[in-house]
């Protein structure tokens, strides 16, 4: 009995040891790797990063460093990327820590969203490659399923409270290696090139400074909303007899195109057909609205012009141009101002318009075309018939009945 018992103990111990080896080999990193950075040397050379390539099943794009500083999106004709967003991304990659080793079986890749996007059209993975100025790989990995911060079981207390809200765990694979690692860090891998662009506040004119907005289209009369003084409501001009404004909000929506406008995509203005350019149906007033423009006039007599064009697929885009106030707008004496003395010369110089604001806006807008959300394009293309309705005749009917 003792010999048999001893044999069973040996067998059980061997089984437990095998199970422990199997568990550690699959679900825990070796002690010398757990908590180690996935790319231990990256942070020290991070300033040498010159390109970030992100590939998914749906898209592939490159963020590239500019010699003058900052970053740009190559597939958007070099439109500026948000430097802070790119920097946060690079620091996020450099800060990824190994938490555990998972499977090496390719049959499990799909479950972890780690099939290669180049080979699987349904892949949910994102391939990330960071390159130096010579094109060499500084870091490369395939990112799969993400556990958001709310699902992270044991966040590292050493990261501090400020870092916990952005903490997540990601299943990753390194190039030419079958092993899947679970890593942890503050990394958000945005999947669209426009996610790295600041798309907010394309226009930012203070509402109180706007005097009027006029929309001109090739197939209809101009549509204009205006007000006499700051703080007043905007009024729709040239309403036909017997008609009235449906509601004030629609006029405010038109003005808001110049107050706080967000765009969805950007391309070179050369890629878009504008009025009199290309073979676009520039006078048909169709969905694209080639030839349509909206002009915002400010109380200081500066203005912003928004022109609408369309791409090869007929989708509408806009471009913008700012113009400073004319010199007379700042002159107190008008055309009769004397210029005989030094004082008059100083007055004329002081009357020169401030062009800094217009120059700043044109630097931001020049050469670019912007795609707006659909509801913004709808606002821009809204006609007079959509803004007015027949006047309420209830009072008149009441008078007739009283007179009868």
Predicted stretch roles:
Residues 1-404:
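Soluble, acidic/polar mature domains that operate outside membranes
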């Amino acid at each position: 009995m003792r010999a048999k018992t001893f044999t069973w103990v040996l067998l059980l111990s061997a089984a437990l040891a095998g199970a422990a080896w199997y568990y550690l080999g699959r679900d825990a990193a070796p002690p010398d790797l757990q908590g180690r950075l996935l790319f231990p040397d990256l942070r020290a050379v991070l300033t040498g990063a010159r390109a970030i390539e992100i590939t998914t099943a749906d898209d592939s794009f490159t963020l590239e460093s500019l010699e003058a500083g900052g970053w740009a999106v190559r597939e958007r004709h070099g439109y500026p990327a948000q430097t802070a967003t790119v920097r946060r991304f690079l620091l996020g990659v450099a800060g990824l820590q190994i938490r555990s080793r998972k499977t090496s079986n390719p049959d499990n890749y799909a479950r972890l969203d780690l099939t290669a996007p180049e080979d699987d059209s349904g892949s949910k993975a994102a391939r990330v490659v960071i390159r130096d100025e010579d094109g060499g790989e500084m870091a490369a990995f395939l990112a799969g399923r993400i556990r958001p911060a709310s699902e992270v079981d044991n966040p590292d207390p050493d990261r501090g409270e400020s870092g916990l809200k952005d903490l997540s765990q990601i299943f990753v694979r390194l190039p030419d290696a079958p092993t899947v690692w679970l890593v942890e860090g503050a990394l958000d891998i945005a999947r669209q090139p426009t996610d790295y662009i600041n798309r907010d506040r394309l226009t930012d004119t203070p509402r109180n400074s706007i005097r009027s907005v006029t929309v001109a289209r090739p197939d209809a009369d101009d549509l204009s909303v205006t007000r006499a003084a700051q703080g007043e409501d905007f009024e729709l001009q040239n309403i036909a007899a017997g008609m009235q404004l449906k509601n004030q909000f629609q006029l405010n929506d038109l003005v808001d195109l110049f107050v706080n406008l967000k765009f969805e995509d950007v391309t070179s203005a050369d890629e878009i057909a504008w009025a009199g350019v290309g073979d676009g149906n520039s006078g048909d007033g169709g969905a694209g609205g080639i030839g349509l423009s909206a002009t915002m006039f400010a109380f200081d007599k500066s203005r912003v012009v928004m022109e609408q064009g369309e791409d090869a697929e007929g989708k509408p885009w806009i471009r913008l141009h700012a113009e400073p106030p004319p010199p007379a707008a700042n002159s107190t004496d008008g055309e009769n101002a004397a210029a005989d003395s030094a004082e008059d010369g100083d007055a004329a110089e002081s009357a020169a318009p401030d062009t800094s604001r217009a120059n700043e806006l044109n630097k931001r807008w020049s050469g670019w075309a912007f795609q707006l959300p659909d509801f913004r394009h709808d606002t821009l293309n809204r006609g007079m018939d959509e803004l007015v309705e027949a006047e309420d005749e209830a009072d008149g009917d009441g008078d007739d009945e009283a007179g009868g």
